[in-house]
Amino acid sequence: MSYSPSLKEIIAILQKYTSKNYQSNCKTRPDGKLELSLNGVFEEIVKTPGKTRYVTHKQLDQKLKDFKQDLMVELHDTFATKTDLKESEARINQKLEALIQIVMVQGEQIKVHGEQINKLTQAVEKQGEKIEAQGQQIQKVNETLNFVVESLGSIHKRLDSMEGRLDSMENRLDKLESK
């Protein structure tokens, strides 16, 4: 977007080249653009403050060229009219409503996901309780198996001692028979 001078800036440029304050008229045209007119500008441009003198065409052309160059503004964009602004406002409102709808839908989806997460959390807690109960059962079975192993170990010791006694009894019987 290019720079566009204000009315005050234009009057300041005019005062740079001239010595009096000009009466300005600023009107809004039907197409929405501004029309600016300044009374008495070109008569004063060729005069030096306090003195009146003749100027050549070349000097006049140069002064007018300098003056126009200072006033020259490149306009690549046109100024928006009220209808353009209203249309733009309507488009913005439509986009805003669409975004609000999207946010509302996403909010509902978040609520649904939150409920699903709560259900999954409850299911995981139940499974955790089941796993804990199974762990306790396994621990009880393990304790029972350890007790059985200890019992079998003591039975094995008894059987070993009984076997030793039986062997010694058998040896005695063999000695008695051999005599």
Curated annotation (Swiss-Prot):
Disulphide bond pairs: none
Family statement drawn from the similarity comment of this UniProt entry: Belongs to the UPF0134 family.
Protein name per its UniProtKB record: UPF0134 protein MPN_145
Organism: Mycoplasma pneumoniae (strain ATCC 29342 / M129 / Subtype 1) (Mycoplasmoides pneumoniae)
